[in-house]
Design a protein with these regions (language model features):
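Conserved Rossmann-fold dehydrogenase catalytic segment
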Residues: 1-2, 25-55, 73-91, 96, ...
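Generic secondary-structure signature for well-ordered alpha-helical cores
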Residues: 9, 18-29, 51-54, 58, ...
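Small-residue helix-packing motif on alpha-helices
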Residues: 13-16, 79, 144
Length: 230
């Protein structure tokens, strides 16, 4: 189920609480990932930031995958095993879990499905809205911002294809571009992914804090973190 972030009048919360909590995702202890967030548009705002952070998470996973794909020599099954292992630790999340499944998935002819998917990412707007909100608040939401721009960049297919012909891969300055990652290198990628996720969440919560102070929402960040766990 989903993580649900209702806002609005607190007097309406008891009328819809049971309905919303019954369809929400559940934590290991059975508690629902759904609580009243705050008055007015607090719920919508927190959901927007949640989706913005998710944009960041997906970009981080994509960059980690790209680095592993180019530097380990592993096929998609091997890469899927790495993400499956990562999902057993601090990186445990829905996105890491489905990344492993996607990497393992094969079509009927034995081809990896992922290898036939165009590297273009669309968007529904919540990532962009989060970045716009951060600009309005004067708060640095740098990681989500770069994730949104990466999606814009992915849509420039013709430009990227021309650039790849004009500037073929090989060396970047004096740095060799074909260094193979060993076990410790793979672990370093995992650590970098984890650190970047922490930065993204810290920036997201900072943005919510500023908006809460300006709008008088009195957001409960502990509750928000709890219902985001799934």
């Amino acid at each position: 189920g989903p993580s649900i972030m209702p806002g609005g009048s607190v007097t309406a919360w008891p009328l819809v609480k049971d309905i919303l909590q019954s369809i929400a995702a559940k934590l290991e202890d059975g508690s629902p990932c759904c609580e009243w967030i705050g008055p007015g548009g607090a719920g919508h705002y927190v959901k927007m930031v949640h989706n913005g952070i998710e944009y960041g998470d997906m970009e981080l996973i994509a960059e980690a995958y790209s680095m592993l794909k180019k530097r380990t020599g592993l096929d998609n099954d091997g890469l899927g095993d790495i993400f499956e292992l990562w999902n057993r630790g601090e990186l445990n999340s829905f996105l890491i879990e489905i990344t492993s499944h996607i990497l393992h998935y094969k079509e009927e002819n034995g081809d990896y499905l992922l290898d036939h998917i165009l590297d273009v990412a669309g968007q529904k707007g919540t990532g962009k809205w989060s970045v716009m909100a951060a600009l309005d608040e004067g708060d640095p939401l740098t990681l989500v911002s770069e994730a949104v721009f990466a999606r814009f960049m992915s849509s420039l297919v013709n430009e990227r294809e021309r650039a790849s012909v004009q500037y073929p891969s090989g060396k970047v300055g004096d740095m060799e571009a074909c260094i193979t990652l060993n076990t410790s290198g793979i672990e370093a990628v995992r650590d970098a992914l984890y650190a970047a996720k922490l930065i993204s969440y810290a920036q997201g919560f900072s943005l919510m804090r500023r908006a809460s102070e300006r709008n008088g929402w009195n957001l409960d960040y502990g509750t928000i973190a709890k219902i985001w766990r799934k």
